[in-house]
């Protein structure tokens, strides 16, 4: 090909390319590449306690948990438990926060044990209070949206608090809630143990605290009582719920009904699974996550949440 012919060929090729590209500069965006709502991230998470067996065996630490959430389960969340935290030292917590941010993870919850508000022994009560303050600060550093701290119980009474204990619990939760509110998150109790798991007591507590920085983590179907009483409690607590823990039995039972309670109340938090057996944790958690995801995906595509091939078990 002569130089003149080559120049003419190149001019023709460039003109054709420009003509092809020109419409793309003025045409409306191709809506086919916009991510549809059904493909957006689901509000799903897994509670770190689900891997306490691996933790105790030295086979997982906090950083391994973050990797597991992001890359094994393809989550955008990490539901933390202070059993995985070696300390509340700020430098250590900031290292964890850096790893959270590196993976672009959201922390919907930090569950804190050994910081329950009431203990009959005043010395122990103060020790737990200081631990609560340290973990509220941890929640702030880690970017948690909710920090769960239990209320505690009086002696062996699992249904009601004494007047002294109740007044103290309400006072402390209001203090904690104000700190949380000032720093952009919430804190509160969980349907977990003691009077927290007795609906009349938990309802009384939620109404008494009455603070915008206070909320409740609902360990679904964790209430005391008959099945009918538990079902009623799960429905009635929904307006106060800001986080959830969904165990194996719920995932394999009334999952759709229980999640519908929250959906009907306008729940905006995350649906977090929790596993307890300390055995085959990777596989068991995957099963629970799949069941919760299936319900949410059904809702997002106009379904009822119930797989037509597998009716929900009561």
Task: Briefly describe each language-model feature range.
Residues 2-74, 196-314:
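Histidine-acidic metal/acid-base catalytic patches
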Residues 79-97, 154-157:
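Glycine-rich, proline-tolerant flexible connector loops at the mouths of alpha/beta enzymes
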């Amino acid at each position: 090909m002569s130089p003149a012919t080559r120049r003419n060929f190149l001019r023709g090729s460039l003109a054709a390319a420009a003509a092809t590209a020109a419409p793309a500069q003025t045409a409306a965006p191709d809506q086919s590449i916009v991510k549809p709502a059904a493909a957006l991230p689901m509000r799903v998470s897994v509670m770190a306690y689900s891997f306490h067996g691996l933790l105790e065996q030295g086979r997982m630490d906090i950083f391994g948990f973050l990797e597991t959430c992001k890359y094994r389960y393809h989550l955008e969340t990490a539901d933390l438990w202070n059993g995985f935290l070696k300390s509340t030292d700020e430098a250590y917590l900031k290292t964890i926060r850096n790893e959270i941010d590196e993976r672009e993870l959201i922390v919907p919850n930090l569950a804190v044990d050994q910081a329950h508000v009431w203990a009959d022994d005043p010395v122990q009560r103060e020790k737990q209070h200081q631990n609560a303050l340290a973990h509220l600060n941890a929640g702030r550093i880690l970017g948690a949206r909710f920090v769960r701290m239990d209320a505690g119980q009086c002696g062996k009474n699992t249904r009601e608090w004494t007047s002294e204990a109740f007044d103290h619990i309400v006072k402390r939760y209001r203090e904690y809630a104000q700190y949380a509110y000032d720093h952009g998150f919430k804190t509160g109790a969980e349907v977990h143990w003691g009077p927290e798991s007795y609906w009349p007591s938990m309802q009384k507590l939620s109404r008494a605290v009455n603070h915008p920085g206070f909320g409740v983590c609902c360990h679904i179907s964790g209430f005391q009582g008959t099945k009918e009483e538990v079902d009623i409690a799960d429905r009635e607590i929904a307006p106060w719920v800001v986080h959830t823990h969904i165990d194996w039995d719920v995932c394999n039972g009334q999952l759709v009904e229980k999640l519908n309670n929250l959906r009907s109340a306008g729940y905006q938090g995350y649906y977090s699974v929790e596993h307890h057996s300390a055995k085959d944790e990777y596989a068991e958690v995957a099963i629970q996550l799949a069941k919760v995801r299936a319900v949410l995906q059904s809702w997002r595509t106009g379904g009822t949440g119930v797989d037509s091939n597998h009716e929900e078990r009561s």
